[in-house]
């Protein structure tokens, strides 16, 4: 089952992306490098729960 997650910027800008992930195939927390438009750089985004 795919679960909705939020990817929060590690640059502490408050920017986030939403996506889905398959919990069975990827049980660990997701970390991915994406573009943060607030600081105009690629930074690490870490998984957080959607409230």
From Swiss-Prot:
InterPro entries: Ribosomal_bL33, Ribosomal_bL33_CS, Ribosomal_bL33_sf, Ribosomal_zn-bd. The keyword Membrane does not apply. Keywords: Ribonucleoprotein, Ribosomal protein. Signal peptide: none annotated. One of its GO terms (cellular component) is cytosolic large ribosomal subunit. It holds the Pfam family Ribosomal_L33. The keyword Ribonucleoprotein applies. GO terms for biological process: translation. GO terms for molecular function: structural constituent of ribosome. Belongs to the bacterial ribosomal protein bL33 family. PANTHER family: 54S RIBOSOMAL PROTEIN L39, MITOCHONDRIAL (PTHR15238), LARGE RIBOSOMAL SUBUNIT PROTEIN BL33M (PTHR15238:SF1). This is Large ribosomal subunit protein bL33. It comes from Francisella philomiragia subsp. philomiragia (strain ATCC 25017 / CCUG 19701 / FSC 153 / O#319-036). The lineage of its organism: Bacteria, Pseudomonadati, Pseudomonadota, Gammaproteobacteria, Thiotrichales.
């Amino acid at each position: 089952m795919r679960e909705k997650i939020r990817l929060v910027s590690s640059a502490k800008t408050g920017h986030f992306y939403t996506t889905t992930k398959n919990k069975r195939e990827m049980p660990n927390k997701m970390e991915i490098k994406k573009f943060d438009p607030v600081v105009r750089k690629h930074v690490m985004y870490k998984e957080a729960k959607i409230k």
